[in-house]
Amino acid sequence: MPARSLKSAALFLALSALSAQEPTLFRTDSRLVVLHATAEDKEGRLVMDLPKTAFQVYENGVLQEIKSFRKEDVPVSLGLIIDNSASMTDKRARVAAAALGLVKLSNPEDEVFIVNFDEAPSLDADFTSDPKQLQKALARIDSRGGTAMRDALRTAIDHVKGRNKKDKKVLVVVTDGNDNSSLEPLDTVIRVAQQNDVLIYAVGLLSDETPREADKAKRALDALTRATGGQSYYPQDVSEIDRIAPQIAHEIRNQYIVTYSPSNQELDGSFRQIRVLVDSPGVKNIRTRSGYYATPDNRKSAGS
């Protein structure tokens, strides 16, 4: 028998023996969806003692089986997105102090980055836990007049989804006016945020705006926060941000983490609407992202 035939026969026998020893493995790659949910009572206070049995999750109207459930203070990748336009000059010091206060009240293992924006966004501090680096970035004032909030949020989402070391991703945006300089459409920003399970919180310092412009800004901020499970705040005076920042930090650290494997595993690119219900007399409101897009890039997990 030729040498090549002898080698082939030996290899066949070895593989046959190996397959006889080892059972066949069947692998599954079920797609998971991770939700970060906030429960509130009628006074807007957090409800933090709910059991798994109180929750029901629906996707496109179909009840889903909850695979895991916990309330845990997990570290987050946190982005601070701060308006640096000319109209913010007198407010920046107060906003910077409140932003640093939020970081100090957050999980010590958080990683934080800062994007300042006027007519264009600027990444002024990459992920860090060093207060001095954050303070330096927040002190940067290079105002050019315009407000490109949507572009800044898109920059922040792209940054956090590509560089984050923590599973949970949160952005806090502070602005004092309606967006007048962005190229990025609002619906695109919302879609990308939902797709990457980024929670967005917004502080709109809009008291100096005309009613029409303030209304436009509110509609945009509310659309962002409602779609992602965050919250919008509209203080009448910048001093109120000292109260709002701790509220945001407290909420981020006291959310429920609910995971389910969709009964519809098709990756057809369609939008899957999510609705969470809580059966508890003390709960008035439950917030989480409103849905996600079933695309191939979410094959293993939608928002983990």
Regions found by a protein language model. Give the residues of each.
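Hydrophobic h-region of N-terminal signal peptides that target proteins for export
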Residues: A10-A20
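Bacterial N-terminal signal peptides that target proteins for export
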Residues: M1-A10
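Scaffold/interface architecture of coatomer-like assemblies
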Residues: A20-S304
